[in-house]
Amino acid sequence: MDSMDLEESPASATDAELSGALRDGRALLKEETEPAFRRSLELFEKALTLARMVGDTTQTRRATRGLAASKRGLGDRKGAIAHLKEVLEMRKTVGDAAGDTDALGAIADIYTELGDLENAGKFYDLYLDALNSEMMQ
């Protein structure tokens, strides 16, 4: 066995780093403290950069959702909405609607928290439509 067999390829090292950043970011979100939200934001930003670097659209969506959750936890609701809308936009390029229903519900909830009931209602309607579509499949 030569030494090359023992070394990770740059791609697999990047994939491992990406997966680790996403995993650790999700774990920090569960702590629900400001320092944990700040650290998770850093990890999801790192994951987003790595996902874009390797061209992994699924991981890009996951990192973007993580950024939204981190920002929401830090009280940046408008930033969270912007990231969740990015997730919905990505569906058009990826062709995969996984996670869209949750994103729609989260956007509706955040608009409710902001007191913007008109937009909240709009996104709750979209959320319910998406739920009904999922149940029909």
Which residues fall in each region the model found?
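Structural motif corresponding to the intra-repeat A-B loop/turn of tetratricopeptide repeats
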Residues: 31-34, 74, 94, 114
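Residue signature of alpha-solenoid helical repeat architecture, marking inter-repeat boundaries
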Residues: 15-16, 38, 58, 98
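Short coil/turn linkers that connect adjacent helices within long alpha-helical scaffolds
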Residues: 11-12, 52-56, 90-96, 132-137
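Amphipathic alpha-helical segments of tetratricopeptide repeats
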Residues: 45-50, 86-90, 128-132
